[in-house]
């Protein structure tokens, strides 16, 4: 059985848009660049040709990866999860015990994780600890050096 890719509907929609862009925009652009580079003649010392071929390989690899993620996407349905329970697709807000600054993240599948946008992978150490916990729970979150104790203050 193939590996499934748990994700939100939003994550799946973004992958579909990325795939469309790769196939309808990026792929034709790089094919055109290869044609232009070929017209320069000798390919053995043609850096533009080599760069375009490298980009083509990257694009084709990404298309394959995205198609696989879409094919085996498992959309998360939180209807059966308690409203105050941390789960994939939900936003969780917590505060380090003894501090006042809150941190909020959405827990998403690995395919859509982007920590800079506040989206952390369900496979990350912090998400693994938080998933299944509820508002008011106090948990120890592993850090590269040591750990921190946090209290879950909000789940939505």
Swiss-Prot record:
Pfam families: GreA_GreB, GreA_GreB_N. PROSITE patterns: GREAB_1. The keyword Cell wall biogenesis/degradation does not apply. GO terms for molecular function: DNA binding; RNA polymerase binding. Keywords: Coiled coil, DNA-binding, Transcription, Transcription regulation. It comes from the Bacteria. Residues 7-27 form a coiled coil. InterPro entries: GreA/GreB_C_sf (IPR036953), TF_GreA/GreB_CS (IPR018151), Tscrpt_elong_fac_GreA (IPR006359), Tscrpt_elong_fac_GreA/B (IPR028624), Tscrpt_elong_fac_GreA/B_C (IPR001437), Tscrpt_elong_fac_GreA/B_fam (IPR023459), Tscrpt_elong_fac_GreA/B_N (IPR022691), Tscrpt_elong_fac_GreA/B_N_sf (IPR036805). GO terms for biological process: DNA-templated transcription elongation; regulation of DNA-templated transcription elongation. The keyword Flavoprotein does not apply. Necessary for efficient RNA polymerase transcription elongation past template-encoded arresting sites. The arresting sites in DNA have the property of trapping a certain fraction of elongating RNA polymerases that pass through, resulting in locked ternary complexes. Cleavage of the nascent transcript by cleavage factors such as GreA or GreB allows the resumption of elongation from the new 3'terminus. GreA releases sequences of 2 to 3 nucleotides. Belongs to the GreA/GreB family. This is Transcription elongation factor GreA. It comes from Lactococcus lactis subsp. lactis (strain IL1403). The gene is greA.
